[in-house]
Amino acid sequence: MTIATPEIQQRVQQLRQQLQKANYAYYVLDNPIMEDSVYDQLYRELQDLESQYPILITPDSPTQRVGDQPAAQFNSIRHNIPLYSLENAFNLQELQKWEERWQRYDQVSNSDYVCELKIDGSALALTYEDGILIRGVTRGDGITGEEITQNVRTIRSIPLKLTLENPPSRVEIRGEAFLPLNEFDRLNGERKQAGEPLFANPRNAAAGTLRQLDSKVVSERRLQFFAYTLHLPEDNSLSSQWESLEWLKKMGFLVNPNCQLCPTLEAVADYFRHWETARHDLPYMTDGVVVKINDYALQNQLGFTQKFPRWAIALKYPAEEAPTRVKEIIVNVGRTGAVTPMAIMEPVHLGGTIVQRATLHNSDRVSELDIRVGDTVIIRKAGEIIPEVLRVLPELRLPNSRPYQMPSHCPECGSTLVRPVGEAVTRCVNSSCPAILRGSVVHWASRDALDIRGLGEKIVSLLVENELITSIADLYQLTPEKVAALDRMGTKSAQKLINAIEGSKRQSWPRVLYGLGIRYVGNVTAKLLTDNFPSVEVLSQASVPTLASVYGVGEEIAQSVFDWFKIVENQTLIEQLKIAGLQLENIASQAVSLTPSSGNIAGKTFVLTGTLPTLKRNEAKALIEKAGGKVTGSISSKTDYLVVGEEAGSKLAKAQELGITQLSEADLLKFLTN
């Protein structure tokens, strides 16, 4: 065996320290201190030295994250301290009752709380001796878990060696391993290409990954880990949960940056309400908030029930997945002629609302699910207005059920349905189809388009059924007398609607273009186009290459706009709208350039709050990101700008407290183009 000289030993130690610092900076601080190429070079040097001098290999070496051989099986390990479940609260009233309960139990009047986002992953218990990771164990049943140390080593945000000069002789760290959403999408994309079953959600993917016998597979899936508590059997110097979180950071762990110390239950409620919406901007799944009494002495006094700690509770968000039964399958024809199958279901509570229908997207999805009337299904709502069917439970299927067949003819007009080559969507191509007309008019009247108050789906349906309109332009030929003759429409209501329609003539050219409903043209794209093509005449004469040359407009959008203006019926519509007096060109005061300039935005961090006057939140986010900026969901010292709309929430107060610059939508648009 080759003997390692003191110089070699020193070099190995230097390499390990440099690589460990780089790992900590990259995975925990999110602040890289080393180029990838430099890291790879140092890693390879350490690997070569350890290969030449195996006696120098230690468990905390960065090269030992991935084991050479798959494990034959996992051993069961009994937890020194049980990993208890948490009692659940499903609304703020139940949270209030929990506080009243523990206060009665201990006769204490108040306490501050630590709020932590409840990560949807797998709980782990990690044991360190003299600062070195020696064991990683799953939660299991809370009493006994599986030892998966070899897999735990592959998680880059778990330090193999604690970053303390004098680490405790023994400490147990607890936290949650999870799969970030971008990794979940990547993993399922790869599995789909390989013809493998898809993971239902990131939690299942994380749990399945941790139980892989081959740690190389685990390493490739890029799990993350948030630490949330520690147990020091030989030291009781820590006095609070908040202090423990600070210690975890010093030890080299990634602690969720969105944890918050709340002085009262009202502050806890504010935290919960904020994240109920803001969680959809996070890069990982969270299904609630964990609320803990901060003071350890009080925790010890309260103790545990047989199942739960009395000093903590999980405040869950309204369910976003739920089972229900399919009563009927129908198809809906939209304004573009797209035929969307819909499942009509028994009512079920989901995401805080009662849901009775869910989208099935298209015929391919119907075939993939093999969904049938009478089936029990799991439906999901993750921020969408209309929930979707996630999966069917075939084991509960009725014996006489029949596969669903998509219709061959439009249920509205009877025309033969077509499926264009290369598309998943079946369409009705009859431009006179009542469903297409209804959808087009509703879109034209929508808030982001012409904003015609009072012209909703019911009134539009009456106008179409009574043949008072056959196109958008016919709206401007309506009279109060014709409208008043409709069911449940009196003279006053009719005049009010006519006034709203007349007022829509003053809406800007960008809104009119968006209202036309050209495929792929959202309101941001409409602003981009009308900035570069100041009138309908200029836009309608533009070639595909000219259209595509506009920043933010690609070939697909350009082709769609070009094709729309070549259709005779659409040319007629434009002429009728001109005669009616609609704004089909930019007025000088309306012309606002939306071509982002990366000079002012690149590298800056933005947070959005409240409702913006014209831009939707995802559109503002897209504009910022196109210009090289970053949009996050919460305020911190790293935030450069807060974009403020109407009904701004707690983010505004926090930004003012931190001295962060606030921008209106107008400020943002100027900033983008300056």
From Swiss-Prot:
EC number: 6.5.1.2
Biological processes per GO annotation: DNA repair; DNA replication
Catalysis performed (reactions): NAD(+) + (deoxyribonucleotide)n-3'-hydroxyl + 5'-phospho-(deoxyribonucleotide)m = (deoxyribonucleotide)n+m + AMP + beta-nicotinamide D-nucleotide
Domain BRCT residues, every copy: 596-674
Alphabetical list of PROSITE patterns matching this protein: BRCT (PS50172), DNA_LIGASE_N1 (PS01055)
One Pfam assignment: DNA_ligase_aden
Keywords, in A-Z order: DNA damage, DNA repair, DNA replication, Ligase, Magnesium, Manganese, Metal-binding, NAD, Zinc
InterPro entries noted in UniProt: BRCT_dom (IPR001357), BRCT_dom_sf (IPR036420), DisA/LigA_HHH (IPR041663), DNA_ligase (IPR001679), DNA_ligase_AS (IPR018239), DNAligase_adenylation (IPR013839), DNAligase_N (IPR013840), Hlx-hairpin-Hlx_DNA-bd_motif (IPR003583)
Enzyme class, UniProt record, top EC level: ligase
Binding site for Zn(2+): 410, 413, 428, 433
Cofactor dependence: Mg(2+); Mn(2+)
Active-site residue numbers: 118
GO MF annotation: an example: DNA binding
Positions of NAD(+) binding: 36-40, 85-86, 116, 139, 176, 292, 316
Task performed by this protein: DNA ligase that catalyzes the formation of phosphodiester linkages between 5'-phosphoryl and 3'-hydroxyl groups in double-stranded DNA using NAD as a coenzyme and as the energy source for the reaction. It is essential for DNA replication and repair of damaged DNA.
Family classification: Belongs to the NAD-dependent DNA ligase family. LigA subfamily.
Protein name stated in the entry: DNA ligase
Upper taxonomic lineage: Bacteria, Bacillati, Cyanobacteriota, Cyanophyceae, Oscillatoriophycideae
Name of the coding gene: ligA
